[in-house]
């Protein structure tokens, strides 16, 4: 497995009689979108593509990912029906994405040659098809020099994003909170000398918090301002089960 899907769904209470959690993941070669339920010996292939990105489970229990082919947006419904649409990205590649809590806006990390920028698009469904359109760059202040290279993104609320970024290729990747209108970026703390590899949003009853995975396998939970709590070590992927 290369990456595991995260979800917008707040986690329910688990009882001893609850069925095993359902996981969605991208295969190690990034060519298959997989689903598996804990306790089962069967792994189901939901969709295939090229260089599939970390998927996300939406509130309607559909699963969304991107393929580098063309490029293509892939959504698999809760009934197993697959919808795919070629997206006009103007020659860019999607390296990461996150769907907003409203299930309409999608934050995108867009690779343009050697640069990576942040964009936002609108998701819509019409007549059994899914579309991503009106993609625009999220403007960042010229003072936000540490965000010249963005590597990952997750929604913290309807108006706030957590992004991982650095100033130069050889720099350390750290987390920032930004407002979607691009009015400013706020550092969420220099955690360690090790770069952050991935960020996901953790839905809770009190709101949403960021969880980041460091390149050394340390998993950290954002609790307040500059405070981060270590959860685990030796981790290779981070997600929230659906």
What do these predicted ranges mean?
Residues 27, 67, 108-110, 163-166, ...:
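Recurrent small/Gly-Pro-centered beta-turn motifs in extracellular repeat architectures
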Residues 8-16, 51-56, 92-98, 146-153, ...:
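Repeated scaffold domains used in trafficking and secretory/extracellular systems
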Residues 29-34, 70-74, 114-121, 170-177, ...:
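Structural motif
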Residues 37-40, 77-80, 124-126, 180-183, ...:
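Short loop/turn segments that connect beta-strands within beta-propeller blades
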């Amino acid at each position: 497995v290369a990456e595991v899907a995260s979800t917008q769904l707040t986690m329910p209470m688990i009882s001893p009689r609850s069925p095993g959690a359902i996981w969605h993941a991208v295969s190690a070669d990034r060519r298959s979108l997989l689903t598996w339920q804990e306790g089962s010996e069967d792994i189901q292939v939901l969709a295939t593509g090229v260089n599939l990105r970390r998927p996300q489970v939406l509130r309607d229990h559909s699963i969304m990912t991107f393929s580098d082919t063309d490029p293509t947006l892939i959504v698999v419904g809760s009934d197993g029906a697959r919808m795919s649409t070629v997206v006009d990205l103007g020659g860019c590649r999607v390296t990461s994405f996150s769907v907003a809590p409203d299930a309409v806006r999608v934050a995108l990390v867009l690779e343009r040659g050697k640069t990576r920028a942040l964009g936002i698009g609108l998701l819509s469904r019409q007549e059994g098809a899914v579309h991503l359109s009106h993609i625009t760059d999220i403007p960042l202040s010229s003072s936000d020099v540490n965000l010249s290279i963005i590597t990952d993104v997750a929604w913290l609320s309807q108006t706030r994003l957590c992004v991982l970024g650095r100033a130069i290729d050889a720099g350390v990747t750290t987390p920032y909170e930004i407002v979607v209108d691009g009015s400013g970026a706020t550092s969420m703390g220099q955690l360690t000398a090790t770069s952050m590899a991935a960020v996901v949003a953790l839905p809770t009853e009190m709101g949403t918090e960021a969880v980041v995975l460091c390149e050394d396998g340390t998993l950290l939970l954002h609790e307040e301002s500059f405070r981060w709590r270590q959860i685990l070590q030796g981790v290779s992927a981070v997600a929230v089960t659906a």
